[in-house]
Regions:
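N-terminal lobe/hinge region of extracytoplasmic solute-binding protein
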Residues: 155-157, 163-164, 176-182, 199-259, ...
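C-terminal motif of bacterial Sec signal peptides marking the signal peptidase cleavage site
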Residues: 23-27
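Extracellular/periplasmic solute-recognition and catalytic clefts
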Residues: 300-312, 440-456, 472-535, 546, ...
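Aromatic- and charge-enriched surface segment that lines or borders ligand/interaction sites
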Residues: 128-135, 252-318, 341, 348, ...
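Detector for C-terminal structural segments
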Residues: 53, 58-207, 550-585, 597, ...
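Gly/Pro-rich hinge or "lid" segments in bacterial periplasmic/extracellular proteins
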Residues: 213-231, 237-242, 340, 361, ...
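Append "and occasionally in soluble cytosolic enzymes with long acidic Gly/Pro-rich linkers
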Residues: 242-244, 440, 450-452, 539-685
């Protein structure tokens, strides 16, 4: 599957939504100190060292003292194929274990997320598990319980979403899975102007052709524009989030076949009358160009992941090919024979292609999404001279020599096509679009995009045929968006949340029912405090749990939503089938506000020292410290310091101590940020537990993409700083799949591991030493 489709159909989730939390049964209790060995914490009791300050000598930080992981082999890679759900046991804390070949393994986030969608085979003669759904639901429960234990982010509120719109728009309906970009295509305007202005508080960045390119997650506004300008996907979602074949695109139902070697082949034939916005014809090559390109070093050099086809047969061999080494053995640790042709990607004729998935992924629970492909203009991913070539004997596809051609730029050799891909990704490149609309203009200063109706696009089975002539997409600010709406400067404000904003929106509708309308739904997701879980204090689960315990989340949610929301305790939507199936047995820590419980977590995690390496004394010491050991001594951790320069990792008598500092970036303007300043950063509870929190105001793109995801093009300067940032996450699809989102694989880590959490339980070396 191409990267944009994979992100859309699998990762999809950085803007999650609300659910009204039903009361939990007795299993939803506050957990006491956790004694598992999973978290990256060195356990301790609050005794500290009794030596005087004069006995400890302060030294310089030595990068040579860093201890970084070298072996990223995962438990799932080694034993995943041997494990069935009936082999798994659950301890009283809700953590999962399995014994294989005499070795007992704790199942980490990577294992559980992969097993949840790839190990749903029903055990033979099982009384408990009768269907793949039963197996999936159990894996899902164990995954949620571990997430709840490790706390990679803190759900702050789960609310109702209100979408406010001008009454001139008819048929505008939204759901947790059917956002404004889909709803506006299906809607009509009843006035002569036939135009609509959409608004969003999330900045546009201009990444409209593939909003996921080079990112772990797409910006929600960029994704809206991509959805409005993209069409002819082989599968689509409907209003309830479920997937179906796009009958206007596929010529007959695509065939799926499990082969003798356990691999799975999808064969897809598309119709012959599909056209881009410039009237150029679409054929099968347009559907596989991105998959091929972004499985090569050229795609990676252009900012892609280079791993789009990682689950397809022959990926390792094809991705190793660089245009010069066909048939040669390459690689140091894992040697493969490079090949020009991608064995698992076949072009059968001009309108038919086939993709074969490896046996490891053939049993995918949501198998239909593996057949999800969208067409792209060939130059977008192949450049002006690149082309798809076919092995006549096998029908396997590859890319021509021109695609791999190199040039010298600034004294360095690089792929020529990589630069073309970067240029072609821009909204105003000469390439056509495939969907209901085309981008006619984008103003980077005001973050405003103008879209015009694509008369060539015939519509689809789900959204129908678009009829609104012009859509303008503008930047909104909370403080002024209601005034803009009443003045006609915006026609749709989507995702209104928060008590004051919701009440203001409803008042506008109630005062002018003939002029304004609203639609609302329970949000499938939540606003959150997200963490960078591989750097500084927030790389420790004990710290993340302590933060969870010192934010009164129930009070926060009620204050922010004005009673139009509540709190959830993990990444789930109470309206989902999986949650409903396990809600009576799931074990969740609700993290009731408690300073003492937070202190207990920190003490248990080894945060028991002061800046002198002595026992922390709350009566006279301000900030706790932790003595680092093992992989806690990572290269980045040795550089950790507060953004204001007051605190940093110190070296005393050859031992390293980390301060309990959290560098928080708050997006502005944002009511959640303002509330967090009061409820968390400057609250007495933070001081009481010995935590120091810095606050840096940021805009969305430099905060999320620059500091959290460390993308230089968004302002990252090469020095890690951020520990926490508030934004939102959402389940915008009925497909709940977080496979690869917790990967240890360093080739995938930056593109897929959105929380940057490497669960120590997932490292295979942990069980072999």
């Amino acid at each position: 599957m191409e990267e944009s489709a994979m992100k859309k159909f699998r990762l999809l989730a950085l803007v999650l939504a609300l659910l009204m939390v039903v009361p939990f049964v007795a299993s939803c209790t506050d957990k006491k100190d956790d004694n598992t060995t999973t978290a990256a914490d060195s356990k301790g009791t609050e005794t500290g060292d009794t030596t005087s300050a004069g006995d400890k000598v302060k030294g310089d930080i030595d990068p040579a003292d860093a201890v970084d992981h070298k072996d990223f082999t995962s438990v799932y890679d080694m034993i995943g194929s041997k494990v069935t759900i009936d082999m798994v046991t659950e301890d009283e804390e809700g953590l999962a274990w399995v014994t294989v070949d005499g070795v007992k393994y704790e199942l980490g986030m990577d294992f559980l997320s992969m097993a949840m969608v790839y190990r749903t085979d029903v055990p033979a003669n099982s009384e408990k598990y009768k269907t793949a759904d039963d197996v999936y639901n159990e894996w899902w429960k164990l995954y949620i319980q571990r997430w709840n234990y490790l706390v990679p982010e803190i759900p702050l509120y789960s609310n109702q979403y209100f979408d406010l719109y001008n009454a001139k728009i008819d048929g505008f309906v939204t759901t947790p899975y059917w956002g404004p970009a889909d709803a506006i295509v299906a809607a009509k305007v009843t006035t002569a102007d036939n135009s609509v202005i959409l608004g969003s508080a999330t900045d546009l960045s201009g990444s409209f052709r593939n909003s996921s390119w080079g990112k772990s997650n797409p910006g929600s506004s960029d994704l809206d524009i991509q959805n409005l300008t993209s069409g002819y996907a082989t599968i689509m979602t409907n209003k309830d989030g479920s997937y179906s074949w796009n009958e206007g695109v596929v010529d007959g139902t695509p065939a799926s076949k499990v082969n003798e070697d356990g691999t799975l082949t999808f064969t897809i034939k598309i119709k012959k009358d599909l056209k881009f916005s410039d009237n150029s014809a679409i054929n099968a090559k347009n559907y596989i160009a991105a998959l091929l390109s972004n499985s090569t070093p050229v795609g990676a050099a252009a900012g892609g992941s280079g791993t789009a086809g990682q689950t397809v047969v022959g990926f390792a061999e094809f991705s190793a090919y660089d245009g010069t080494n066909d048939g040669k053995e390459v690689g140091d640790k894992n040697k493969v024979t490079a090949t020009k042709f991608f064995k698992g990607v076949q072009l059968l004729d001009d309108y038919t292609f086939a993709v074969t998935y490896t046996s490891d992924y053939a049993g995918y629970y949501y198998s239909i999404v593996n057949a999800g492909f969208s067409p792209d203009p060939l130059p977008l991913y192949l450049g002006s001279e690149g082309a798809i070539v076919v092995d006549e004997a096998t029908k396997a596809c590859g890319l021509n020599d021109a695609f791999y051609a190199k040039v010298t730029e600034n004294g360095a050799e690089t792929y020529k096509v990589a630069g073309e891909i970067v240029a072609n990704m821009k909204w105003n490149s000469a390439l056509p679009y495939s969907g209901p609309y085309v981008v006619s203009n984008y103003d980077d200063n005001t973050h405003t995009a103008t879209l015009k109706l694509n008369p060539v696009y015939p519509g689809d089975s789900f959204r129908g045929k678009a009829s609104i002539a012009t859509i303008t997409y503008v930047k909104l600010v909370d403080e002024t968006q209601m005034d803009m709406f009443k003045q006609g400067q915006v026609d749709v404000i989507a995702g209104i949340t928060g008590g004051d904003a919701t009440k203001a929106a409803l008042k506008i509708v109630n005062d002018n029912p003939d002029k304004y309308k609203e639609t609302h739904y329970d949000r499938a997701g939540y606003g959150k405090l997200g963490f960078r879980c591989d750097f500084g204090s927030t790389s420790f689960a004990s710290v993340r749990r302590a933060i969870m315990l010192t934010i009164n989340r129930n009070e926060f949610a009620q204050t922010f939503t004005g009673g139009y929301g509540s709190v959830v305790h993990g990444p789930y939507y109470e309206g989902s089938a999986a949650y409903k199936a396990v809600k009576d047995t799931i074990k969740l820590n609700v993290y009731t506000y408690s300073v003492q419980s937070a202190i207990d977590e920190l003490v248990d995690g080894g945060w028991i020292y002061n800046e002198k390496g002595e026992k922390f004394d709350a009566a006279k010491d301000t900030v706790r410290y932790k003595k680092l050991s093992g992989y806690e001594l990572s290269s980045d951790n040795l550089k950790f310091k507060s953004t204001d320069g007051k605190y940093s990792v110190i070296k005393l008598d050859g031992e390293y101590y980390m301060p309990l500092v959290v560098n928080w970036y708050g997006t502005q303007p944002n009511d959640v940020t303002n509330q967090l300043v009061t409820a968390w950063q400057t609250a007495k509870a933070a001081k009481d537990i010995g935590m120091y929190i810095t606050y840096t105001s940021t805009e969305f793109n430099p905060g999320i993409y620059g500091e959290l995801y460390r993308m230089e093009e968004n302002g990252y300067d090469g020095t890690p700083k951020l520990n926490a940032i508030n934004f939102a996450t959402g389940f915008t699809s009925a497909v709940y799949d977080y496979a690869f989102n917790w990967t240890l694989n360093q080739n995938l880590y930056n593109d897929y591991n959105t929380a940057h959490l490497m669960d120590e339980a997932d490292f295979y070396e942990k069980y072999t030493k």
